[in-house]
Design a protein with these regions (language model features):
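N-terminal secretory signal peptides that target proteins for export/translocation
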Residues: 1-2
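Sec-dependent N-terminal signal peptides
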Residues: 5-14
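A short, amphipathic edge element
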Residues: 23-25, 91-101, 149-150, 202-206
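Edge/loop elements at the starts and ends of beta-strands within beta-rich repeat scaffolds
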Residues: 33-40, 53, 108-110, 135, ...
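One face of beta-strands
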Residues: 40-46, 60-62, 68-76, 129, ...
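An acidic-aromatic
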Residues: 49-108
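Gly/Pro-enriched, hydrophobic low-complexity segments
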Residues: 111-220
Length: 223
């Protein structure tokens, strides 16, 4: 049986529209989970792994408040990319994005939907992100390309927290474009020379505990 070219065109057009709608629906589910958490405070243990410099494990306090206030408070130094520390950014799950459904993929024993997200805000630092989202709308993996901080990726582990907050996040990032806190005393010129001949990828593992959620966190915490 011969198929009419117009029929094939309409079929693929419909399929494309369905995939687009499905991607938006999945992001909407993530957004709904996200909006349940108005604020939180948590304890964090940060382990940074960089080939050419030894960095001790740090303890930190983490503060978050909607829509985009985020603070790591740690004594001394904790090397993290600015975007990597605040992965649930509004830039990725608000309505001002183009979302494209790619495929299904299994991470561990979790079936996820892979979505590419392009922020439409010209001022967004994020150019393109790929999200691996489970059927209960938790992000298990993220890869982002940014204008100013290179490329970073993150993998999330969860326990049974009622607000679907992660127990651990493992972030891989470009060491030369990471956020360096004020007061960091390492010789950056020497560090940059070493990084030119070695792997410039760093890894940070952040373990969270002691979440306090929706306590009415003051804006003063972020000043």
């Amino acid at each position: 049986m011969k198929k009419h070219p117009l029929s094939l065109f309409l079929f693929f057009l419909t399929l494309s529209a369905w995939a687009q709608q499905d991607a938006n629906s999945i992001l909407s589910g993530v957004r709904t989970n996200f909006l349940k958490v108005k604020d939180y405070t948590a304890d964090a243990e940060i382990k940074v792994d960089v080939d050419f410099v030894k960095i001790p494990i740090k303890k930190a306090k983490v503060y978050y408040k909607q829509p985009d206030k985020f603070r790591f408070k740690a004594e001394g130094f904790a090397l993290l990319p600015k975007r990597g520390a605040n992965l649930f950014t509004v830039n990725l799950i608000n309505d001002n994005v183009t979302a494209i459904y790619i495929k299904q993929e299994v991470i561990g024993n979790i079936t996820t939907d892979v979505i590419k997200v392009i922020p439409l805000d010209p001022n967004s630092d994020i150019i393109l992100s790929t999200l691996w989202i489970s059927r209960d709308y938790k992000v298990y993996k993220l890869e982002s390309t940014t204008k100013n901080q290179g490329t970073f990726s993150a993998q999330f582990q969860y326990t049974n927290h009622p607000n679907n907050l992660p127990a651990q996040v493992e972030i891989t990032f470009d060491i030369q474009k990471a956020e360096i806190p004020v007061g960091f005393t390492l010789d950056m010129e020497s560090l940059n020379k070493k990084s030119q001949s070695k792997n410039t990828t760093g890894k940070a593992t952040v373990k969270y505990s002691g979440y306090l959620v929706n306590t009415g966190l003051s804006d003063a915490v972020f000043k």
